[in-house]
């Protein structure tokens, strides 16, 4: 047994180290003071440093790392199969390969927990701002949905459109403005005043669409990344959402709220439109569940251009409802729940509670 342990000593030590980090994280995550010290004293400054370094490059380092990881995984799979075939002691060889794979997996889990998972247990936007979601009264929901529909109608006439009346603003211009979108919130929420690094468009955006993702924040590089293939009318609000993650805010509900607030207050027409549109979509979905007649009344008040954009967005995503989307969204849901958010992916839509509480 000792000889067997010594034979795989490095892999076993690697395993124990990762296990120790994960156990320690599980024990300390209930301590708000410990998580605040980790996030605001170590990981957030570190991610901002990563982000500054990667911002100098014209491509997404996160996307490059994903590609390299996929290629490396394929090469390692071939090498391990060859190793197993050639090995005389196939049981020990299989154990060594399995141990190596487990070590790599736990390393990613441990690093991700430290760089990102800790944010779920540290002070968040609601803790710092004093705002908090509360039960929504029907009358307030209807009032705020009508308000957003009215502002959305006004904003729709301020953006570029193509010959079919669809939103047609330049995507690169939207990305270029992103690092200024939060300037309008610093007076009300000074703790949000952190350096911004503009989101980067993903080259393999169709793969993101197949997984039902419009954007993601990558803590290993401090980069915000956005889908450049999905309809452009919500690209600006996606940028703002991912920039909220850059500030160490993990809650999807809070990031959606901040994205809507920043977009609707900034001085860029494309961001105005995207902010009111994103807010309207979530509010109207909630109103539809509460009162379909009222939902129809509000929807009928929208101009034809907005309705065309909504249909375009729905038609695009209806093409990506297959097994890949269900699988990746299920994984995302489980990941969010594993860090203590009982809503999982439903937390994106829970922004309604914050919006109604703020605007009612």
Locate each region found by the language model.
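N-terminal membrane topogenic signal
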Residues: 2-15
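Pan-zinc metallopeptidase signature
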Residues: 305-360
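Transmembrane alpha-helices and immediately adjacent membrane-cytoplasm interface residues
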Residues: 73-78, 92-126
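Membrane-interface segments at or immediately adjacent to transmembrane helices
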Residues: 117-187
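Active-site recognition of the HExxH zinc-binding catalytic motif
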Residues: 58, 235-256, 260-261
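Auxiliary, metal-adjacent structural segments of Zn-dependent hydrolase domains
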Residues: 160-228, 232
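Membrane-embedded alpha-helical segments of integral membrane proteins
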Residues: 19-83
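Post-HExxH zinc-binding segment in Zn-dependent metallohydrolases
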Residues: 139-143, 148, 250-294
């Amino acid at each position: 047994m000792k000889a067997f342990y010594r034979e795989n000593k490095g892999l076993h030590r690697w395993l124990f180290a990762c296990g120790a980090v994960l156990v320690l994280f599980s024990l300390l995550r209930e301590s708000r003071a410990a998580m605040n010290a980790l996030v605001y004293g170590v990981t957030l400054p570190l991610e901002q440093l990563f982000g500054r370094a990667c911002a100098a490059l014209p491509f997404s380092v996160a996307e490059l790392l994903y590609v390299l990881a996929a290629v490396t995984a394929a090469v390692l799979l071939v090498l391990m199969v060859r190793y197993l075939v050639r090995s005389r002691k196939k049981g020990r060889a299989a154990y060594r390969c399995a141990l190596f794979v487990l070590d790599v997996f736990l390393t990613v889990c441990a690093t991700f927990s430290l760089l990102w998972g800790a944010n779920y247990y540290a002070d968040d936007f609601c803790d710092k701002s004093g705002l908090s979601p509360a039960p929504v009264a029907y009358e307030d929901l209807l009032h705020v949905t009508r308000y957003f529909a009215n502002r959305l109608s006004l904003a729709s006439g301020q953006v570029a459109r193509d010959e079919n009346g669809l939103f047609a603003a330049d995507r690169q211009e939207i990305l270029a403005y992103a690092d200024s979108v939060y300037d309008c919130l610093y007076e009300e929420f000074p703790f949000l005043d952190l350096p911004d690094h503009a989101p980067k468009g993903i080259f393999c955006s169709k793969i993101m669409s197949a997984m039902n993702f419009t954007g993601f924040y990558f803590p290993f590089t401090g980069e915000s990344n956005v889908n450049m293939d999905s309809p452009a009318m919500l690209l600006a609000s996606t940028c703002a959402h991912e920039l909220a993650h850059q500030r160490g805010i993990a809650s999807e509900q809070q990031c959606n709220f901040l994205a809507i607030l920043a977009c609707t207050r900034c001085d860029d027409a494309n961001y105005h439109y995207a902010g009111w549109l994103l807010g309207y979509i979530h509010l109207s979905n909630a109103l539809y569940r509460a009162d379909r007649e009222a939902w129809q009344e509000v929807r009928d008040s929208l101009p034809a251009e907005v309705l065309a954009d909504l249909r375009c967005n729905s038609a695009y995503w209806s093409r990506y409802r297959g097994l890949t989307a269900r699988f990746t969204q299920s994984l995302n849901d489980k990941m969010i729940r594993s860090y203590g958010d009982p809503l999982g992916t439903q937390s994106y839509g829970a922004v309604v509670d914050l919006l109604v509480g703020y605007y009612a």
